[in-house]
Regions:
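Active-site phosphate/pyrophosphate-binding segments
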Residues: 259-263, 267-295, 385-514, 588-608
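Structural beta-sheet core signal
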Residues: 4, 97, 160, 171, ...
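Conserved short alpha-helical segments that host acidic/polar catalytic motifs at enzyme active sites
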Residues: 1-249, 261-292, 304, 331, ...
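Glycine-rich oxoanion-binding loops at beta->alpha junctions
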Residues: 49, 70-83, 272-285, 309-345, ...
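Glycine-rich phosphate-binding loops that contact phosphosugars or nucleotide phosphates
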Residues: 289-431, 435-438, 520-560, 583, ...
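Acidic/histidine-rich
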Residues: 155-186, 456, 461-487, 522, ...
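Generic C-terminus detector
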Residues: 226, 541, 567-608
Length: 608
């Protein structure tokens, strides 16, 4: 969840580190710091707060060193303050460490180090690593780091400087992402590609327990036993501009405007001669015939995509589907075997709870199909089959375009499995595919008409509590709409199945309560109209979202009707979520919230 950047080369390190950290702000953080090795001295500057605060402190320093590490911290051990910020230095000032992850046995290690005479200044688990590297360091930094990673338990991405090693530094990872960027006379490390994309497109993706040694002219990688590893160079195929705002006020709005393109990019390469072809999924008819159940496992927004996936896969494939929150799945001893398929969904491909859930399912014999957005990510590498969502980099913490492409990918998976199982015909599949291809045009129309949503938000942004209700696929939409609103506007919100209102929720409805009702399912339209009448009778204000064809009828009961272009009920969630995203965006904007970087949240959750 933190951001790590490291540099060694011929440039001054500080500008490279600050630039890289600024590209990782989307990951969420509460403090920042850098360490530079200059003439055999480690200079560490760090502070609580935004990166701009760190830049102010650096103006008073003259740090010209050409090797350094930087970090943005999101607190897991110890409150956000200057002392707990990274980098952490060892007792003698010989070692500096940045760390992302959680060291589970840090208390035992801390007690050992205290017994050896080490004093601790912070409340973090990371300080243990700095002291432990110093404890083992006898002139060989690589050997010391190897010994440390053999002792620590938990997850980590590490960058380690030593004042005596002026021409090299070391990094390592386990269960937390870290990449190495390869330059000409310079090399880099980073938590994510945007931090170093300005300098190189060639990277190494480190595997668990691999250690990399960086000099200006070389990168050597070793496994946990110290044996050299020949790494394959991965070439990044997207541009720096893809991770910039491009004239928009916020990344979130830019990314909503990118939804039509990324949906097309996710569909079009997989349609050949008018038929769906998923080359990356090698599940045969025989494999499908053996399937007794499908699990979908994810967190947050990706979980809500999975709820839609359950409806679609069960309808098109007639296979039971269970949707699980990843953090619950791995601890509840799920009944998994080789007759199951587990679909893993993650934008980053590094979500730690989801990664561990994947490994739990795989250990029990399940086949793993992942839907991820980052090529070469940990989840992708651990999967049997991968379907990439070509959403490009998503910088805003609140997911928008990645969610739309996750939905799109789930529809493609359902079509592929249904065709192979014989539960849908080619004609039915082609009709659904044609409907999916129309979705981008519909979203473009929604974005053109966004002013209606903006006006409604202006009139209702002071709402204290907002309820979302829907049925079937619209209930899944309600879950996501409610989460988006909570994430970025900090307004309390809950989502309920429409049929559950009378079972308790309606007690919360009073005069002026705002209720949002996605209504895209033709078969359930009248049921939802009844729900609207129920809440209206108790004084609620109702915002409804439906196809254009229903507008006139719905205006008789709802206070405000937002429309999406007419689309089949089955595929409607992909376009109907865009008005919900816009609603959350404008509510947050009216309240003066930081839309792209909401409080307490991180983009990529790489700790449990």
């Amino acid at each position: 969840m933190c951001g790590i950047v490291g540099y060694i080369g011929n440039k001054k390190a500080i500008p490279v580190l600050i630039n890289g950290l600024s590209k990782l702000e989307y990951r969420g953080y509460d403090s920042a710091g850098v360490a530079v090795n200059e003439d055999g001295k480690l200079n560490v500057i760090k502070c609580k707060g935004r990166l701009s605060f760190l830049e102010e402190r650096l103006k008073a320093e003259k740090l010209d060193g050409c090797m350094g590490i930087g970090h943005t911290r999101w607190a897991t051990h110890g409150e956000p303050n200057d002392v707990n910020s990274h980098p952490h230095i060892s007792q003698s000032g010989e070692i500096a460490v940045v760390h992302n992850g959680i060291i589970e046995n840090y208390i035992q290690l801390k007690e050992f180090l205290i017994g050896q005479g080490y004093n601790f200044k912070s409340d973090t688990d990371t300080e243990v690593i700095a002291h432990l590297v110093e404890y083992y360091y006898e002139g060989d930094l690589v050997d010391a780091v190897m010994k440390v990673i053999d002792e620590i338990e938990g997850s980590y991405a590490l960058g380690v400087l030593c004042k005596d090693e002026e021409d090299m530094f070391v990094c390592a990872r386990k269960d937390s992402p870290l990449i190495v960027g390869l330059g000409d006379g310079e090399n880099f490390i980073a938590s994510d590609i945007p931090a170093i994309l300005e300098y190189t497109r060639d990277i190494y993706i480190l595997e668990d327990k691999e250690v990399a040694v960086l000099t200006r002219d070389s990168v050597k990688v070793f496994n946990s036993l110290g044996a050299p590893v020949n790494k394959e160079v991965f070439k990044v195929n997207w541009d720096v501009e893809a991770a910039e705002k491009g004239g928009f006020e916020h990344f979130m709005m830019k990314e909503m405007y990118e939804e039509p393109k990324v949906i097309r990019d996710t569909i079009n390469p997989r349609v050949k001669n008018g038929e769906l072809v998923l080359d990356s999924i090698n599940i045969t008819k025989e494999d499908i015939a053996k399937l007794e159940k499908i699990y979908i496992v994810a967190c947050g927004t990706a979980y809500h995509a999975g709820v839609v996936g359950k409806y679609i896969i069960e309808k098109l494939c007639r296979i039971p589907v269970e949707v699980d929150v990843a953090s619950e799945f791995r601890y509840r001893d799920p009944l998994i075997n080789d007759k199951n398929l587990t679909i893993i969904i993650s934008q980053s491909g590094e979500t730690l709870d989801t990664l561990f859930a994947l490994r739990e399912a795989k250990k029990s014999g399940s086949r793993i199909l992942s839907i991820v957005n980052v090529v070469g990510s940990s989840i992708a590498r651990d999967s049997d089959d991968v379907l990439y969502t070509w959403a490009g980099p998503e910088i805003a913490v609140a997911s928008t375009k990645a969610y739309n492409t996750q939905l799109t990918a789930l529809y493609l998976v359902a079509l592929d499995l249904g065709l192979k199982k014989g539960t849908i015909s080619k004609e039915e599949a082609n009709n659904i595919l044609a409907s999916l291809k129309e979705i981008p045009n519909g979203i473009e129309q929604i974005l053109k008409n966004k002013e209606d949503i903006q006006k409604f938000a202006h009139n209702h942004y002071n709402a204290k509590s907002i309820f979302f209700i829907g049925r079937s696929l619209d209930y899944a939409l309600s879950l996501e709409g409610s989460l988006k609103l909570k994430e970025i506007s900090y307004i309390h919100s809950e989502a309920y199945a429409g049929g559950e209102l009378k079972h308790g929720t309606i007690a919360l409805i009073e005069k002026g309560t705002l209720v949002v009702c996605p209504m895209t399912q033709d078969a359930l339209f009248e049921k939802m109209v009844s729900n609207i009448r129920e809440v209206k009778a108790r004084g609620a204000v109702v915002l409804a979202i439906t196809q254009e064809k229903n507008k006139t009828e719905l205006e008789k009961t709802a206070d405000m009707v937002l429309t999406i272009p007419d689309v089949d009920s089955l595929t409607a969630p992909i376009s109907a979520v865009t008005p919900l995203q816009l609603f959350a965006y404008y509510m947050a904007l009216e309240k003066g919230c930081d839309v792209d970087k909401p409080r307490n949240l991180a983009k990529s959750v790489t700790v449990e």
